[in-house]
Amino acid sequence: MAVANQPRTLAEKVWSDHVVVSGSGEGAAREPDLIYIDLHLVHEVTSPQAFDGLRLAGRPVRRPDLTIATEDHNVPTVDIDKPIADPVSRTQVETLRRNCEEFGIRLHPMGDVEQGIVHIIGPQLGLTQPGTTVVCGDSHTSTHGAFGALAMGIGTSEVEHVLATQTLPLRPFKTMAVNVDGELPPGVSAKDVILAVIAKIGTGGGQGHVIEYRGSAIESLSMEGRMTICNMSIEAGARAGMIAPDETTFEFLKGRPHAPQGADWDAAVEAWKLLRTDEGAQFDTEVYIDAASLSPFVTWGTNPGQGVPLSDSVPDPEMIFDEGERSAVEKALAYMDLRPGTPMREIPVDAVFVGSCTNGRIEDLRVVADVLRGRTVADDVRMLVVPGSMRVRAQAEAEGLGEIFTAAGAEWRQAGCSMCLGMNPDQLAPGERCASTSNRNFEGRQGKGGRTHLVSPAVAAATAVRGTLSSPADLTAEPTR
């Protein structure tokens, strides 16, 4: 972290604004800073033990007004008016409801108009704002960094600490700049950008860092695209990801339920405009990517860094000289049941999943609908389209997108995390292969024995139509209707 009166990065500015008590000592022996938390997001999976800890200690929630809960990970995306069938999932959801009632926390339960994936409803409600600190017991809290917030996932013991004190002891992070300059080619999305970034720096490349995404290509993205970028910072090993707020940010936030109003809005925007990295500020690490060189990107392996352009082929481990890396590639190919040299476009899929906190927003659904309009999903492919929130679903319905999905043969579901992870009924069967707009392709992530290829919404939709990994450019035939 920069010292006082020196140029500072965006992350350093937000950090220093939230230090309650500075840690003593120097270097590795330095004690953590105590950081104030502006927004605490809660869901059913990582919170039960935290509330139990409060109960045992006789403590209240310090700031219930800065805490908001929703049900997302374990909820079904069909028959939401019926009891949850799985007993573990049902218990977690019921426990969250009891805890929120007991401790006075606002909850958006399954079926509520504001219910949805926690990282989608925060920005949707205007709760996520520039210059704030945001935490949640979930890895992909980094999503909120798209607004210039310092947002990070925390463990269950830390969830309890924030509930009890509204603070968190943290050691300062290193800083990394990922500069993406130039103009993105047609058909290249934010998802392709972040998959290319992770392939370049590796899944451990950002370890211990807060990544700030910069450059003209980043500035050209919508807020939804920026959220996709920041969402997957954790897949690069980073603690958080951030993008400096600008007019795009302000336009997205203006008028949302929890955004400042009137004179308060004007004052907030003036303050938010200062949330930029100072000229001359030093990053610990810098990465440069030419936007014009990017193309649709897909993963072939079992971690998000094992990816290539869609135009490439499955890598050959015999061409890798590092023994450890070669062994990892061989293991991934065996699990994925892929042969080296196979063109990525020739890989067939059994399922396509559109959704998650990475790509479950209205902009993503519009892209998918544009590809599916007048076309049909391949006969041997099952396609699930799952909105990230009930608000997103309602907007999609109002725009006629739901009709496009169902006419094409896709399943149009209710809001939830769905097939992103195997914690609810939406799962792959062993051996099934899925093109997924989610963020993780670990072994068994979408169900035991399932095989996952991470893709953008456009690639997901084209893949559903052709039955093999594809981009919309591969759909040469005109729509049939």
Swiss-Prot record:
InterPro entries, per the entry: 3-IsopropMal_deHydase_lsu, Acnase/IPM_dHydase_lsu_aba_1/3, Acoase/IPM_deHydtase_lsu_aba, Aconitase_4Fe-4S_BS, Aconitase_4Fe-4S_dom, IPM_dehydratase_rel_enz, IPMI_cat
Pathway the protein contributes to: Amino-acid biosynthesis; L-leucine biosynthesis; L-leucine from 3-methyl-2-oxobutanoate: step 2/4
A Gene Ontology biological process term: L-leucine biosynthetic process
Highest taxon, organism lineage: Bacteria
Residues involved in [4Fe-4S] cluster binding: 357, 417, 420
Keywords: 4Fe-4S, Amino-acid biosynthesis, Branched-chain amino acid biosynthesis, Iron, Iron-sulfur, Leucine biosynthesis, Lyase, Metal-binding
One function term, GO molecular function aspect: 4 iron, 4 sulfur cluster binding
PROSITE patterns: ACONITASE_1, ACONITASE_2
Top-level class of the enzyme under EC nomenclature: lyase
Similarity-based family: Belongs to the aconitase/IPM isomerase family. LeuC type 1 subfamily.
Assembly mode: Heterodimer of LeuC and LeuD.
UniProt cross-references to PANTHER family, sorted A to Z: 3-ISOPROPYLMALATE DEHYDRATASE, HOMOACONITASE, MITOCHONDRIAL-RELATED
Function of the protein: Catalyzes the isomerization between 2-isopropylmalate and 3-isopropylmalate, via the formation of 2-isopropylmaleate.
Descriptive protein name: 3-isopropylmalate dehydratase large subunit
Phylogenetic placement of the source organism: Bacteria, Bacillati, Actinomycetota, Actinomycetes, Mycobacteriales
Name of encoding gene: leuC
